[in-house]
UniProtKB/Swiss-Prot annotation:
Catalytic activity: [GlcNAc-(1->4)-Mur2Ac(oyl-L-Ala-gamma-D-Glu-L-Lys-D-Ala-D-Ala)](n)-di-trans,octa-cis-undecaprenyl diphosphate + beta-D-GlcNAc-(1->4)-Mur2Ac(oyl-L-Ala-gamma-D-Glu-L-Lys-D-Ala-D-Ala)-di-trans,octa-cis-undecaprenyl diphosphate = [GlcNAc-(1->4)-Mur2Ac(oyl-L-Ala-gamma-D-Glu-L-Lys-D-Ala-D-Ala)](n+1)-di-trans,octa-cis-undecaprenyl diphosphate + di-trans,octa-cis-undecaprenyl diphosphate + H(+)
Species of origin: Helicobacter pylori (strain ATCC 700392 / 26695) (Campylobacter pylori)
Lineage: Bacteria, Pseudomonadati, Campylobacterota, Epsilonproteobacteria, Campylobacterales
Chief location bin: membrane
Gene: mrdB
Known pathway: Cell wall biogenesis; peptidoglycan biosynthesis
Protein name: Peptidoglycan glycosyltransferase MrdB
InterPro entries assigned: Cell_cycle_FtsW-rel_CS, FtsW/RodA, RodA/MrdB
UniProt-annotated location(s): Cell inner membrane
GO CC terms: cell division site; plasma membrane
Length: 381
């Protein structure tokens, strides 16, 4: 039942050197705050790792048209939110799965769908030396903007911006001709003040609070918690901001402030190093000499997501960005974001582990392969 050892030779263990410490410390903080929440988080961890291994055995390079099916299925789910979505905290972002009463947030799987489809389209149409021209750019932009518009309608400005930054960040880094990106950049600068008038009142208030001289209550308490942590942090009993509930949403949106109060400036620097190291490690796959664009785009997309999520969340807790509901990746309490990232890492590890052994188009002899490796090959043929 063992996997062929050659698969493990290409399995990238370094991401887990970064991920495991995040999960351990996150679980500790959540447990200190609430034993009940820590049990739920443990369930999310279990689901995430189970899905990681399930996804690891899916032959993504062979899916082809099925990636379009997955994409459009996610778009349909996003559209259904407008008609039969479940509202919570003033936003309609969830669907209730019949008979089992479990809520699904379609904006999470759609990130995976967009990334896989972009990887597939770029693989079959690699960027020319000078970058993509208007034709290919508009084609790829359609698949990015359609779900982003549906997410924005929910309304969920934060997630919509994440989708746009991931999608267009990939296109910009992969390569666009100057006559494409320069007018787009100018148009963005001109359109930004106009777009402000189309925001919801609560979104305008967040921007106004951010620009005001005095931060709002949530951000103020977050800054106090961060400052009170000192260089080495405090014991659990001495974390007054969290203990006495001054710090809002201490295990979710503002968990960075809770972490710094607990582990201080030194802990914050280590956390920065983990996120920067993980993002750069994934980003550097783009510079591999081979022409495996599917792998490069998936790794680049995950890198952008981790960098943007962590940067925005930390900036938000420091009062350097408007307060939006963006979690700290692989660290904040909750299942949706964590499970999404574990699925993405499962896809990445699949692309790494099986790219040389099977080639997906070759027909090797199966005699020397383990049972599970043969099963993967059979599913992909």
């Amino acid at each position: 039942m063992a996997l062929d050892k050659r698969i493990w030779m290409h399995f990238d263990l370094l991401p887990f050197v970064f991920i495991i410490p995040l999960l351990v410390v996150s679980f500790l903080l959540i447990f200190e705050s609430s034993a009940v929440l820590s049990l739920k988080q443990g369930v999310y961890y279990a689901i995430g790792f189970i899905l990681f291994w399930i996804v690891f055995f899916i032959p993504f390079r062979k899916l082809g048209r099925w990636l379009f099916v997955f994409y459009w299925a996610c778009v349909i789910l996003l559209a259904l939110v407008d008609f039969m979505g479940y509202s919570k905290l003033g936003a309609q972002r969830w669907l209730v799965i019949p008979f089992i009463s479990i809520t699904l947030q379609p904006s999470e799987p759609v990130k995976i769908a967009i990334l896989l489809l972009l990887a597939h389209l770029i693989k079959i149409n690699p960027p020319p030396f000078k970058g993509y021209d208007w034709g290919m750019f508009l084609k790829l932009s359609f698949y990015i903007c359609l779900p982003a518009a549906l997410i924005l309608k929910q309304p969920d400005l934060g997630t919509a911006l994440i989708v746009l930054i991931m999608g267009f960040g990939i296109l910009l880094i992969v390569g666009l001709r100057t006559r494409v990106w320069l007018p787009l950049f100018i148009a963005l600068l001109v359109a930004s003040p106009i777009a402000y008038h189309f925001l919801h009142d609560y979104q305008k208030k967040r921007i106004a609070d951010f620009l005001s001289e005095k931060p709002n209550y949530h951000v103020m308490q977050s800054i106090i918690a961060i400052g009170s942590g000192g260089f080495l942090g405090k014991s659990k009993e001495a974390c007054t901001q969290t203990k006495f509930k001054f710090l809002p949403i201490a295990t979710s949106d503002f968990i960075f402030a809770y972490f710094v109060e607990r582990f201080g400036f030194l802990g914050a620097m280590l956390l920065f190093a983990i996120y920067i190291g993980l993002s750069l490690h994934l980003f550097f796959y783009l510079f591999e000499s081979n022409s495996d664009w599917f792998l490069k785009i998936v790794a680049l997309g995950i890198s952008i997501l981790i960098f943007v999520y962590s940067s925005v969340n930390i900036a938000m807790t420091l009062g350097l960005a408007p307060v939006v509901g963006i979690p700290l990746p692989l660290f904040s309490y909750g299942g949706s974001s964590f499970i999404t990232f574990m699925i993405l890492f499962g896809i990445l590890e699949n692309l790494l582990a099986f790219r040389y052994i099977f080639g997906y188009n070759s027909k090797p002899s199966f005699g020397n392969f383990g049972f599970l490796a043969q099963l993967v090959r059979a599913l992909g043929s």
